[in-house]
UniProtKB/Swiss-Prot annotation:
Signal peptide stretch: none
Family: Belongs to the ATPase alpha/beta chains family.
Record site: Required for activity: 371
Name listed for the protein in its UniProt record: ATP synthase subunit alpha
Subunit relationships: F-type ATPases have 2 components, CF(1) - the catalytic core - and CF(0) - the membrane proton channel. CF(1) has five subunits: alpha(3), beta(3), gamma(1), delta(1), epsilon(1). CF(0) has three main subunits: a(1), b(2) and c(9-12). The alpha and beta chains form an alternating ring which encloses part of the gamma chain. CF(1) is attached to CF(0) by a central stalk formed by the gamma and epsilon chains, while a peripheral stalk is formed by the delta and b chains.
EC primary class: translocase
Family annotation (InterPro entries): ATP_synth_asu-like_sf, ATP_synth_asu_C, ATP_synth_asu_C_sf, ATP_synth_F1_a_nt-bd_dom, ATP_synth_F1_asu, ATPase_a/bsu_AS, ATPase_F1/V1/A1_a/bsu_N, ATPase_F1/V1/A1_a/bsu_N_sf
Native organism: Caulobacter sp. (strain K31)
Amino acid sequence: MDIRAAEISAILKSQIANFGEEAAVSDVGQVLSVGDGIARIYGLDNVQAGEMVEFPKAGVKGMALNLERDNVGAVIFGQDQAIKEGDEVRRLGEIVDVPVGRGLLGRVVNPLGEPIDGKGPIVSTERRRVDVKAPGIIPRKSVHEPVQTGLKSIDTLIPVGRGQRELIIGDRQTGKTAVAIDTILNQKAANAGTDESAKLYCVYVAIGQKRSTVAQIVKTLEEHGALEYTIVVVASASEPAPLQYLAPFSGCAMGEWFRDNGLHGLIIYDDLSKQAVAYRQMSLLLRRPPGREAYPGDVFYLHSRLLERAAKLNEDNGSGSLTALPIIETQANDVSAYIPTNVISITDGQIFLETDLFYQGIRPAVNVGISVSRVGSSAQIKAMKQVAGAIKGELAQYREMAAFAKFGSDLDASTQKLLARGERLTELLKQPQYAPQAVEEQVCVIYAGTRGYLDNIPTSSVRRFESELLARLHSQHKDLLDNIRTKKALDKDLENTLKSVLDNFSATFA
């Protein structure tokens, strides 16, 4: 093999000429062990808690959660099959963040903010950290504007205000998601207008659900024209636990963008029980000490720091709001389990859905006796307060009397009247799915129920009475509905008009 000196010197000269003094320094570690979505890493001495790390060989990212003396425990945001012992791990020097802004509306994304709907890349210029501190006391204002769910039983008895956290709790298959989806659909009219203060942008976070279920929900939103003002964040049942844990925080960061820009957001977490289970799995695999029901000690903090980010801000901070509707699934109506009691104590009220009511055909299956809204009544519009004040007491009396009436003893006339009224009001509060009602329609219908217009018609005809009354109002008395909507109160003139409409209608109803 002949060695040409000229060639060698030319190569050396070019290498010397191209030699740069700058050197890239990166903090690198090695994988000690990996499995179940958790990696133990040696090295990375300067990594921060909650910092993103990268596994370049496998092309996935993770987050450092446990900083121990001799190793770092990291959760992996993706499949861990491609990661092997001894693989290189790099610090990214950043905390988990996601894209935010209007560009996400109408899109379906994963918890890292990457699109999964096949509609191309997300158009967004701004990114936000997923886990930030909730607003303090000074920037906040008390809840005073309503969130209209479009469901009579909720808007009349358990009203929700903008900036509130209202828990939806019940067993599986009791219609929890249906209540949340109807609330999104009911915002269509407000979001179609030009008044930004009336609009409510929605974020739906699906945690640990079947992909087919999520696809059906997205299809429903699309068919009803509601997807255009909604962001859907999905961590399905087949995703690793760290992504199911991250999804609510990602959705919240997207919703907070609306709140902090003087707009109004609504976020639905469906459901937080599955996030708690995912967090329990991660914590146990990271060898953190278990507590009650094997959940880690900070599972309360997990939910409180998430739900405290829903707030109504004052004028100095843009008057924006973020309303949260967390969903919790119970086992056999047991609301005294660990996670349900935690979330009940964090939220500003709860809507209880019961299996028994659901199978009796009372849908939405809201138990109005034990459901409460701690701050929503101050957000209710005056017209609704005027007509719904009586219904609460009457339904409470009806439930008490109905329990005694089971014994079959002879009932006096006043008790029979009370039972008859209660039956009709219960029937009146029933509502089919995907058929939310505008607040002015609800006011007219509830007025008819509480003022005795239904007392003389059979219970089976209540639904027909309602639909025909609304048809009459829309065809002949549109101005009455418009006035209730704009004035938000029933003054003497409006009440007299409504009375005469109802008198004429009930005289002809048969």
